[in-house]
């Protein structure tokens, strides 16, 4: 049984609606944000929507599944990913002073890189959970089947992503405490 015959689960509609409502709520809550925040969110959203459209097109060519169906499923996972980065950006703006120190921005970059690596794995794994592994076989969606069924690939991406995320968090806390103690000394 291929992806083209899977029925659209009503739970997916709820996930899509929930993802969009949360995104709009967060944007309304932070209406006073500065232009850097707006540009960051816009850029990330465009990246994720572009990625979802590209993957939808690729899988449509391979499996013959309608692009709208796949686009909506990808919007769920990528919409949640964009919300995650939105929250990370807000937390970073609140915790880091307006004069961002160079070492602190490196820590934030490492944190975001680790989260990007983890998000790719979680997004693919989430698709397997939604669709069910029984719908995948070697003749359909070869790339996704290979990623989902090859455990070493999961560890090669998830472990470095987790390590980079932890390093980013530790460095961020370390540099944050050092900057706070320097500002108190002045």
Where are these regions (language model features)?
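Aromatic-rich, lipid-facing transmembrane alpha helices and their immediate juxtamembrane interface loops
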Residues: 1-184
């Amino acid at each position: 049984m291929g992806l083209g015959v899977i029925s659209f689960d009503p739970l997916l509609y709820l996930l899509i609606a929930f993802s969009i409502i949360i995104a709009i709520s967060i944007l309304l809550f932070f209406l006073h944000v500065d232009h850097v925040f707006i540009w960051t969110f816009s850029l990330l959203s465009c990246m994720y929507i572009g990625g979802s459209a590209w993957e939808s097109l690729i899988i449509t060519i391979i499996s013959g599944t309608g692009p709208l169906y796949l686009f909506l499923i990808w919007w769920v996972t990528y919409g949640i990913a964009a919300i995650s980065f939105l929250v990370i950006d807000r937390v970073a703006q609140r915790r880091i002073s307006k004069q961002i120190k160079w070492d602190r921005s490196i820590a934030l970059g490492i944190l975001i890189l680790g989260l990007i690596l983890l998000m790719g794995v979680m997004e693919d794994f989430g698709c397997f959970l939604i669709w069910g592994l029984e719908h995948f076989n070697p003749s359909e969606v070869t790339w996704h089947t290979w990623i989902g069924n090859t455990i070493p690939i999961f560890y090669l991406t998830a472990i470095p992503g987790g390590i980079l995320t932890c390093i980013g968090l530790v460095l961020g806390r370390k540099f944050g405490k050092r900057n706070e103690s320097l500002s108190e000394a002045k």
